[in-house]
């Protein structure tokens, strides 16, 4: 008999486990005294097909912590009891150890505990020592995904493949998504967040043929709901503040929470940061959307599905899934056709990497110099600035950097745009549903991301006279209305009611300092309004209809990484309009705009009525 007596105190057990003469057998001896219990601790079942966080009961920590003591390196200083307990709880939470119970806890042999540590070290890319050494403990403290790494006992067996599958997939190929709430802490604007999340979904769409469509959750229940939350947020994975668990997502299924993806709002979410102060949102989003599609964690060194945060992964426009993740995804949803002429049902928001060699430009359509300005259209599309000129366009990332100094081809990017369309005169992203509208002549085309939807439609739908075309179009977030400018006049369109507003056109001179017949107008990610004409731009602060005193300024140095002019350019300013009484006009416009404003801002309207007027 290895353990005399019928009851053993924790102190006595520590003494017995530590003694070298205690027993030559294993700890699985049936002679180990058992304490009477009503039954093992039961975790309430969940109908959601997602991994569960298995928390180690308090009574199981001392025993398993003591069992791990012999696994510590002999020459290293043993960590204290709190660190060992943390390690055991960590291994249990992330699936490497089963939950302890008072009846079967003694079945945990040292060999099985060593195996669990080795699997953890394999996932982390550490030497598989089977010991809770300092590097292992340090890795356990790294920021990571909330979900377990091992899905059942089979996950402990070394596989030829590194990826793991949850066993659940979406039964449809078009998935809808929506953002329930944005981060309250991050300096990233909602528009940039939406763009990064769209790109993260597009990464998976490229390799699977799946289609992701953003919808308004007020009108349609999305498959994937994205939520920035803190601490407990009504699921089984409460967040732990900055630096611990970063995010989690639920596997596909029929439950309302299936596919939902949550980010810890106490993290400092960044994008394109060159320092270590923050967590790259795009990298984490790609990882979590892998879970939302049915992938588990992977131990492959380069996999985006490794459980630990690995830092930024690069430009969303060029990022592609590593091979291990592609293999796992295609096990679930099949392979994308390898025929280069075959088109998947949905293209990503960004094109795949361009071929290394491109045909020379035709003399009829030479590549223009971006620093010359005179753009045909400028638009903010999901946080990126598109600048159109002839059959070309440039793109600026949300960080303000050029995607490439070389422009992209118009028809190569916008699939389905008629070949006879050589110039885009105006463009904007419709805020109601994210559709992208391109204008040329008296017509416009509607795109779902890059794919054309339907035939050309006439501009008369926006309230313009038949045969009229536009100089500029933009949606103003101050009141949610869409503005269409032609020459010295502008029209206004109500997107919600889907009709032109009465009382238009009006004089563009109401926008004090704006140039007549601008090349285009767009809204920045910070909410400022920018008029573009020729080689210069005019800035209007958020919510203002008066140009800033430093306007106009050259476009090139500010937007396109062009050298600053040697001297201040001589710009012919638009004719200044004399100040005139606008009390009635202001009153009418404010009454209309107030329907779109937050109730918290309504008491401030009398204070600013002298500055905000009808336009």
UniProtKB/Swiss-Prot annotation:
In this chain the Hemopexin repeats are located at: 368-417, 421-466, 467-515, 516-562
What do the Gene Ontology cellular component annotations say? Answer: cell surface; extracellular matrix; plasma membrane; side of membrane
**Broadest EC class assigned to this enzyme:** hydrolase
**Cofactor binding, note field:** Binds 1 zinc ion per subunit.
Q: Which SMART domains match?
A: HX (SM00120), ZnMc (SM00235)
The source's domain of life comes to Eukaryota
Q: Where is this region: Disordered?
A: 336-366, 547-582
**Which positions are annotated as binding Zn(2+)?**
145, 287, 291, 297
Q: Where is this motif: Cysteine switch?
A: 143-150
| GO terms for MF | metalloendopeptidase activity; peptidase activator activity; zinc ion binding
Tell me which family the UniProt entry assigns to this protein: Belongs to the peptidase M10A family.
- What name is this protein filed under? Matrix metalloproteinase-25
Classification lineage: Eukaryota, Metazoa, Chordata, Craniata, Vertebrata
């Amino acid at each position: 008999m290895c353990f005399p007596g019928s009851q053993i105190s924790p102190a006595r057990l520590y003494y017995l486990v530590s003694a070298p003469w205690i027993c030559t057998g294993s700890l699985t001896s049936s002679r180990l005294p058992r304490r009477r219990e009503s039954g093992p601790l039961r975790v309430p079942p969940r109908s959601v097909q997602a991994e569960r966080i298995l928390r180690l009961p308090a009574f199981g920590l001392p025993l398993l912590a003591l069992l791990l003591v012999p696994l510590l390196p002999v020459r290293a200083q043993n960590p204290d009891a709190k660190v060992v307990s943390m390690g055991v709880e960590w291994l249990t939470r992330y699936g490497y150890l089963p939950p302890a119970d008072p009846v079967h806890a003694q079945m945990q042999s040292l060999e099985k505990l060593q195996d669990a540590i080795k699997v953890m070290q394999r996932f982390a890319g550490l030497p598989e020592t089977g010991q809770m050494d300092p590097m292992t403990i340090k890795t356990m403290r790294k920021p990571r995904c909330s979900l377990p790494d091992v899905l059942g006992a089979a996950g402990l067996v070394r596989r030829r493949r590194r990826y793991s599958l949850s066993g659940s997939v979406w039964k449809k190929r078009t998935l809808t998504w929506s953002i329930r709430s944005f981060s309250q802490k991050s300096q990233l604007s909602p528009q940039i967040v939406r763009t990064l999340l769209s790109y993260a979904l597009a990464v998976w769409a490229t390799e699977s043929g799946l289609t992701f469509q953003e919808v308004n959750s007020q009108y349609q229940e999305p498959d994937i709901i994205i939520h920035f939350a803190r601490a407990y947020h009504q699921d089984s994975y409460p967040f732990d503040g900055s630096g611990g668990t970063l995010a989690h997502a639920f596997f596909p299924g029929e439950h309302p929470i299936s596919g939902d993806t949550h980010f810890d709002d106490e993290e400092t979410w960044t994008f394109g940061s060159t320092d270590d102060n923050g967590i790259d949102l795009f990298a984490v989003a790609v990882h979590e959307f892998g879970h939302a599609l049915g992938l588990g964690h992977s131990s492959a060194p380069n996999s985006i599905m490794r459980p630990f945060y690995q830092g930024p992964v690069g430009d969303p426009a060029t990022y592609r899934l590593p091979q291990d993740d592609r293999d796992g995804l295609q096990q679930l949803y099949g392979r994308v056709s390898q025929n280069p002429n075959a088109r998947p049902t949905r293209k990503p928001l960004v094109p795949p990497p361009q071929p290394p060699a491109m045909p020379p430009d035709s003399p009829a359509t030479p590549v223009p110099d971006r620093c010359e300005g005179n753009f045909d259209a400028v638009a903010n599309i999901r946080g990126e600035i598109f600048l159109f000129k002839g059959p070309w366009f440039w793109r600026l990332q949300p960080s303000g950097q050029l995607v490439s100094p070389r422009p992209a081809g118009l028809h190569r990017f916008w699939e389905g745009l008629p070949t006879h369309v050589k110039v885009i005169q105006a463009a904007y992203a419709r805020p109601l549903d994210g559709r992208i509208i391109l204008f040329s002549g008296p017509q416009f085309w509607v795109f779902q991301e890059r794919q054309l939807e339907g035939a050309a439609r006439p501009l008369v739908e926006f309230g313009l006279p038949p045969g009229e075309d536009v100089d500029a179009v933009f949606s103003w977030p101050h009141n949610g209305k869409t503005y269409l400018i032609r020459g010295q006049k502008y029209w206004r369109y109500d997107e919600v009611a889907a009709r032109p507003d009465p009382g238009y056109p009006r004089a563009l001179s109401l926008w004090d300092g704006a140039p007549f017949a601008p090349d285009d107008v767009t809204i920045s990610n910070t909410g400022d309004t920018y008029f573009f004409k020729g080689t210069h731009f005019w800035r209007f602060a958020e919510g203002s209809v008066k140009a800033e005193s430093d306007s106009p300024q050259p476009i090139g140095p500010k937007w396109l990484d062009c050298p600053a002019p040697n001297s201040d350019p001589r710009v012919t300013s638009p004719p200044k309009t004399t100040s005139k009484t606008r009390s009635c006009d202001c009153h009418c416009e404010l009454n209309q705009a107030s329907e779109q404003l937050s109730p918290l801002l309504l008491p401030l309207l009398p204070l600013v009525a002298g500055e905000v007027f009808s336009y």
